[in-house]
Amino acid sequence: MAVIPWYANEKVRALDARLIESGVPGLELMERVGRGVVDFILKQPLARSALILAGAGNNGGDGFVIARLLMEGGWKVTVLLSHEAARSQGDAAVNLTKLGKMPVPVVESRTLDEAALTELLDSHDLVIDALLGTGAAGAPRGETARLIAAVNRHRFGRHVLAVDIPSGTEGGEGIEAQWTCTAGGRK
């Protein structure tokens, strides 16, 4: 059995920064993470329907790559943003723009009441948490907290996969994920 080390969020951020400084572009890192997550997903017995919860930062960017790759693979995909699309930052914004050229519904969560949010969750077999990554600190707030609570209330009968780290675990209010896909080591 292989031993997989656990890393604190600060160490993971430092490792990511070193990779980027060594010449690996952030967009390439997102692409690698997205492909790794999709490779894992495709090995699971799922109904080919995914709702991707995406934050404004790099974890959301990973989610946009995952959405694009699943859509290219014939999946029904919907992206639910925890923020206004214009607030996506850096490489995440680049990947959201790429995704915008595909027939993938992208919905801002603030536009949904509780009934519409529940209906959206219920219409997908897999929920992918790409809200907050290792850069998050403290308890989730606002729409992010609302989405985490909704997923935890309605997770029965569907699969929940977290990208990088379950969102909100730093603040003790995290997504209850069935699976967590990480790059580099356990966090």
Regions found by a protein language model. Name each.
Residues M1-R48:
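Positively charged, low-complexity intrinsically disordered leader regions
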